Amino acid sequence: MRVKGGSVTRQRRKRWLEKAEGSWGTRNTSYRIARQTVIRAAEYAYRDRRNKKRDFRKLWISRINAAVRELGYTYSQFMNALVKANVVTKDGQGLNRKMLSELAINNPEAFNQLVDKVMK
């Protein structure tokens, strides 16, 4: 005798359709397309959680570079001086790029003092 699945199949499909809520067009009504949409969204989310770390690091470096160039130095010269002065260490102790970027934006006077101190 054939078993069609009935309520189990309906529940499973309903779960996929609920995850696709907010999608446009048939992406939230058609089971097959909704399932593909949800799977692809999960792949993008997984990938971009990793890319976000790269993007923010690039942003912080750009901001630090811009702030340091106003004072006549390059980013690489500044970071080298920070490492030699033990302000930034390889094991993550001390100031990191995020902190330096925030300091350059929100408190330029303190950032300028830091640059003057380590570049001597």
Curated annotation (Swiss-Prot):
Gene3D superfamilies tied to this protein: 6.10.160.10, Ribosomal protein L20 (1.10.1900.20)
GO cellular component, one term: ribonucleoprotein complex
A GO molecular function held by the record: structural constituent of ribosome
Gene Ontology biological process terms in this record: ribosomal large subunit assembly; translation
Coiled-coil zones: none
Record keywords, A-Z: Ribonucleoprotein, Ribosomal protein, RNA-binding, rRNA-binding
InterPro entries, per database record: Ribosomal_bL20, RIBOSOMAL_L20_CS, Ribosomal_protein_bL20_C
Recorded family membership: Belongs to the bacterial ribosomal protein bL20 family.
Purpose of the protein: Binds directly to 23S ribosomal RNA and is necessary for the in vitro assembly process of the 50S ribosomal subunit. It is not involved in the protein synthesizing functions of that subunit.
HAMAP family named among the record's database cross-references: Ribosomal_bL20
Name of the molecule in the record: Large ribosomal subunit protein bL20
Source organism per UniProt: Ureaplasma parvum serovar 3 (strain ATCC 700970)
